[in-house]
Amino acid sequence: MKIKTSHLIFVQGILLVVFLFITAWFNRFSADDYLFIGRLRDFSFFEFYEKLYLTWNGRWTYNFAILFFMKFSEYKYFLFAFNGLSFLLLFYSIYLVLAALNKKYETNFNIKTVLLYAIVFIGVFFFFTHFTGQSWFWISASLAYLWSCIFFLFGLSSWLKQTHRFFDYLVIIVCCLYIGGSNEVLALLTILILFVSFFFKGNTVLKAITSIVMLGSISVNYFSVGTTFRDNLTPNLPFVELVLYVGYGTVKYVFIDFYKTILPAIIFGFPFFILGTKSSVQLYKNFNIKKDLFKTLIFVFLVVFINQFIVIYALGGLAPDRSTITSSLFSSLAIVRFMFLYGIHSKEIKINFKPALLIVVVLMLVFNGVFYRIHKNYSQSVDERTIVILSNNKNEPIRLKKLNNAGYLNSAEITADSTNFLNQHLKYGLGVEQQIILQEN
């Protein structure tokens, strides 16, 4: 049987899906997860929800979501089911966006192609994301970061429709509410884009409603007592230090970590170039590879810069990798757009894509094999540690061995300091009285 490029792209996508679900299978609770488990054991849902909003953060939609899901944490396969739900929602939201674009620009790709490339985009987004262990797999963070991106994509799919019905407005409103109450960076960047969009033609009513709802939601977040309390705990950087921190964060994201994130994302997204070469529609006739590549890079740089500025200004320190997922989403969309358009305007180039795709498939096979072993060993070490803690009846500190490498998962590792919040959360979540300490080698 003759192997087609579509077959290789399909295998590439399947290997990604296998990786995501196997990794989810080996996922374990970590850090703040144990705090939520303990609090929900000692307080009612609404007591703890009120406490979070008034004393810790104003992320009102995120707080509701995390408490809702963590009510099911006692079930054995809860984390696997949660991660699986996240991936399915992400897949469906991307599919809706691609389907809307397919209809809007009349590219006439069949549903199988749209479904396949929704998986390919997940791969681009995944590899573009810094520290996926926190923003994708760690439930305490993914509900704020990955899920806000999912809601953004659902809203975008409704926005892209040529005619907007009541249901589309409802979807957009719900999405804006969730984003504003969970991911401040994504909310502010969306508001900025909406502001710019008012200078162009379009549905003014839709723009106004979206802007008002997003502003309202983030206001409930920002002006909360909990957010004010948390802001008082973080330092205010002098202007020079702020510039240096933002500059370093931007350079690190774009250049220093290029080989770990952007390069793998581009390689995995190569099928979008191939898809462009097969398109029967000539989109963007003024496309110029140098100019449009420059515009794409400038867009990515600006998004990363704004993302870094918002987080660093608020925290008074370097931005946590999980907080850059907004940059990863917008950059993934920009890179995929460029590759597709480049493919459309490169139809005269006669290239055999199969060797390149075969290399990607082989790399994904190796990738799956390596990280299967890493994640399996990590999960076993966490399970063994949990057994040691729960079976210890001695009234003395419990000294634990170091966990194995967590790979793409968020590590549940603690410290040698029994008073560290990681140690205290683990102790509280498991309901033990003894101090828990990481044994120093």
Where are these regions (language model features)?
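Transmembrane catalytic cores of multi-pass membrane glycosyltransferases
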Residues: A24-G84, I139, G180-S323
